Structures are given as C-alpha cells and as structure tokens.
C-alpha cells in the first residue's frame, strides 16, 4: 500500500509538472529575475527568493486554471489532446483545486513578503489570463494573443514593485518588450498548427486573416520589439553615464 501511495504521488507530481507549463513558467521566472537584478533594493536574498517563488507559483496556478477551462478544446486538438486533463491522467476537479490553491497562496504570500500593490497586480494577472483571456478573448477575437499577452508581460513589473518603488519605467519597458514579443512568437506556432486551431474553432490570426498577413504583422511586432530593446539599452546607458558624472 505504501508503494502504491508513493507511485500515485509521483504520478501526480509528473502530471502537475505538465499542467504548470514549465516552458512558460521558466520565462516568467527569467523575466521576473531580470527585473529584480535591475531594481534598486536593499531587500534580503531570502525576500527576493520568496518573491520570485510566489510569482512563479501564481503563474503556475493561472496555467493550471487555463488548462482546466480549456479541457474540452484541448481534447479536440492534436497538439493538446494528450495533456493531463483531456487524457484522463488527472481529474478536472483535482486540477481546478490545485490551480485555485496555487493562485490563492501566491497572492496572499506576496502580500506578506512583498507588498499590497504587488499582491493586487499578481491577482489581476492571474484573473486576466485564466478568466478574461482563456474564457473570452481566446474565442472572440483574432487579437486574442495581442490583448491577452499583457498577462505574460507583467511578471517583471510585479517583481520590481515587490522590492522597489524607484525607477518604475525600467520594468515597464521590460513589460513592453515581452508584450511585443508575444504575438510573433505565438503566431509562428499558430501558423504551424493552423488547421488544428481552425478545427477547434479558435479564431487565431492566421485562421482569420491568412498566413501572408500574419507574417507581415509578425514583422511589424518584431521591429517594434527590437526598438523597445534598444530604448531599454539607451536608458541604462544614459543612467550609467549620469551616475559617473
């Protein structure tokens, strides 16, 4: 019985790892860490580590809730039909409960280890992605990724305001870079899985406007993203120059 319980726990953790979308979470951690390294702060490494962990936990919770809301659509798409919920490897109720627990404790934890502003922004980000984007935007407009991309762009801002109240324009530029990067990144996958999205009746940009126009828009967003990266570099350079004088 102990061996069976152990195997069940291991299997649950494996399925949980898939549910939290580790590729997405690693990006959240990386961008939040970049903001923390730039932010002027005298917070301890422990506080910074807890803040980063709680942001990752909140992102994990919203990813799980996203998969719970999308479980029916996922079962219709070749790319997603083997995910834990549609494949039956984890129950929908278990996934929902886990997502809610992760989301709740991340927001509450950030209130104690960060501040109320960061906690509220994290709660907004979770709701924006898991409810507004997943339940509404994704199914209503070809601009779903553009508008919904705000959720994925906010972690640097959350991380920054958790430990610092100075020079807020830096994390806003980081947010802008990720926001502009999201459409070309997501549309590349949408082009590759164009038929999959069409079969699931999801109005991705390539499905609604064709591949040629999508490629044109990808180039526009890429150009704007590069410009925003250069603006961050210029700000950092001028800031360093001012400090040296």
Short names for language-model regions:
Residues 30-34, 38-69, 120-131, 171-181:
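Membrane-embedded alpha-helical segments that form the functional core of polytopic membrane enzymes
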Residues 92-165:
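Intramembrane alpha-helical segments
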Residues 37-51, 107-118, 156-176, 230-236:
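Helix-coil boundary and interhelical linker segments in multi-pass alpha-helical membrane proteins
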Residues 12-24, 84-95, 132-151, 204-216:
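Interhelical loop and helix-boundary elements at the membrane-water interface
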Residues 79-120, 209-233:
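Multi-pass membrane catalytic core of lipid/isoprenoid biosynthesis enzymes
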Residues 237-245:
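Single conserved hydrophobic/aromatic residue that forms the stacking wall/gate
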Residues 69-87, 187-212:
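Cytosolic, membrane-interface loops and tails of multi-pass inner-membrane proteins
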Residues 42-43, 149-190, 194-195, 211-212:
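Functional transmembrane core segments of multi-pass inner-membrane proteins
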């Amino acid at each position: 019985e102990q061996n069976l319980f152990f195997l069940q726990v291991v299997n649950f953790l494996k399925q949980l790892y898939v549910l939290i979308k580790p590729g997405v979470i690693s990006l959240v951690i990386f961008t939040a860490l970049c903001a923390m390294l730039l932010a002027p702060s005298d917070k301890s490494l422990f506080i910074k580590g807890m803040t980063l962990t709680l942001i990752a936990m909140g992102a994990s919770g919203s990813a799980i809730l996203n998969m719970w809301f999308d479980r029916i659509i996922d079962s219709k798409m070749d790319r997603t039909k083997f995910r834990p919920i549609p494949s039956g490897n984890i129950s929908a109720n278990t996934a929902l409960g886990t997502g809610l627990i992760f989301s709740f404790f991340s927001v509450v934890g950030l209130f104690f280890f960060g501040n109320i502003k960061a906690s509220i922004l994290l709660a907004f980000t979770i709701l924006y992605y898991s409810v507004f984007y997943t339940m509404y935007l994704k199914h209503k407009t070809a601009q779903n990724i553009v508008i919904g991309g705000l959720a994925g762009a906010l972690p640097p801002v959350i991380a920054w305001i958790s430990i610092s109240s100075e020079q807020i324009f830096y994390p806003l530029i980081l947010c802008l870079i990720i926001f502009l990067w999201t459409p070309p990144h997501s549309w590349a996958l949408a082009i590759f899985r164009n038929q999959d999205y069409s079969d699931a009746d999801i109005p991705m940009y390539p499905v609604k406007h064709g591949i040629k126009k999508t490629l044109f828009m990808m180039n526009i967003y890429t150009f704007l993203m590069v410009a925003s990266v250069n603006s961050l570099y210029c700000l950092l350079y001028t800031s360093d120059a001012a400090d040296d004088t």
